[in-house]
Amino acid sequence: MTNIRKTHPLAKIINNSFIDLPAPSNISAWWNFGSLLGVCLILQILTGLFLAMHYTSDTTTAFSSVTHICRDVNYGWIIRYMHANGASMFFICLFLHIGRGLYYGSYMYLETWNIGIILLFTVMATAFMGYVLPWGQMSFWGATVITNLLSAIPYVGTNLVEWIWGGFSVDKATLTRFFAFHFILPFIVSALAAVHLLFLHETGSNNPSGIPSDSDKIPFHPYYTIKDILGTLLLVLTLMVLVLFSPDLLGDPDNYIPANPLSTPPHIKPEWYFLFAYAILRSIPNKLGGVLALVLSILVLAIVPLLHTSKQRSMMFRPLSQCLFWLLVADLLTLTWIGGQPVEHPFIIIGQLASILYFAILLVLMPTISIIENNLLKW
């Protein structure tokens, strides 16, 4: 008799995705982040669901309802901080996952890569709308500033912004619709993640060497299930250390002040995971130009596969490209730092140089250095 997990229509899908899946024998810990992102998503949906049971999306009670969750609901404080810091863990895993893809040439799987970019945009939208919900000062002014960027779109901009706001400013209508979208988007993310996985399983995983590994595959279970469990334990440990010892480390103190449309905070800035894009936005002294640069800072990832000029897939055996990759990492850290600084000298010029370098590395230097490496190897 055949095993039920191989014959049952539903169990068969799970079996082919997580049990009998042929996986390369040499994938490193950098391949753990896909499963960690899945864990983050499940954690966010669960904590978010319990928060939604006690949250009210009305401007008069939103701030109070979050306070109520933290003070009066059983273990409400831990659910709230797990959700807030879970978002940070989500983005840390996202950035490492994308970095892995860039380093090892995983972007050559075009469908998987492009679905990944759509996922990134969706998760960023979800996180932005979630940040608005507590209705603190930074929530309100962050929402005002970021939605206002759409007014830079020629001809339809102003109408578009007022349509999104549901009025002439960020108000009740805005908060209610943001809560609705923030609730539904994670489920859309889940569906997209399933499609992401579907496309990945069409080709199979890449591996650190970038060389096809069809001749050397091992079953996903038990080898990578146990490895993923270890990764999950480390992720949860890190998250809980953050939640239980310094839950407000990554937040903004201004968000503990209830939203006040009549008082602008001295420095409006988004959560840390958006600061790199915010720095690129601010480094261009023109509104429309800044918005375009902001969108392109993420969309540039879609062009990366088209600019792959190397004869090798992975950077494992390409020291010059490795140097450029780590320069890109340092540049992104610089942009993140600049995004949190006031708009004054010397931060303005540093931000502009870092922004230019970011696009230069991805669009010009990487393809050029790859050609040089090909020539050095007489390929």
Swiss-Prot record:
BP terms from Gene Ontology: mitochondrial electron transport, ubiquinol to cytochrome c
GO MF, any single term: ubiquinol-cytochrome-c reductase activity
Annotated membrane topology: Multi-pass membrane protein
Entry binding sites for heme b b562: 83, 182
Pfam families xrefs: Cytochrom_B_C, Cytochrome_B
Residues reported to bind a ubiquinone: 201
CDD domains: cytochrome_b_C, Cytochrome_b_N
UniProt-listed SUPFAM superfamilies: a domain/subunit of cytochrome bc1 complex (Ubiquinol-cytochrome c reductase), Transmembrane di-heme cytochromes
Compartment(s) of residence: Mitochondrion inner membrane
InterPro entries, per database record: Cyt_b/b6_C (IPR005798), Cyt_b/b6_C_sf (IPR036150), Cyt_b/b6_N (IPR005797), Cytb/b6-like_sf (IPR027387), Cytochrome_b (IPR030689), Cytochrome_b_C_euk/bac (IPR048260), Cytochrome_b_N_euk/bac (IPR048259), Di-haem_cyt_TM (IPR016174)
Ranges that cross the membrane: 33-53, 77-98, 113-133, 178-198, 226-246, 288-308, 320-340, 347-367
Record bears the keyword ATP-binding: no
Residues reported to bind heme b b566: 97, 196
PROSITE patterns: CYTB_CTER, CYTB_NTER
Subunit annotation: The cytochrome bc1 complex contains 11 subunits: 3 respiratory subunits (MT-CYB, CYC1 and UQCRFS1), 2 core proteins (UQCRC1 and UQCRC2) and 6 low-molecular weight proteins (UQCRH/QCR6, UQCRB/QCR7, UQCRQ/QCR8, UQCR10/QCR9, UQCR11/QCR10 and a cleavage product of UQCRFS1). This cytochrome bc1 complex then forms a dimer.
Additional remarks: Heme 1 (or BL or b562) is low-potential and absorbs at about 562 nm, and heme 2 (or BH or b566) is high-potential and absorbs at about 566 nm.
Annotated PANTHER family: CYTOCHROME B (PTHR19271:SF16)
Family from the record: Belongs to the cytochrome b family.
Designated name of the protein: Cytochrome b
Organism: Eira barbara
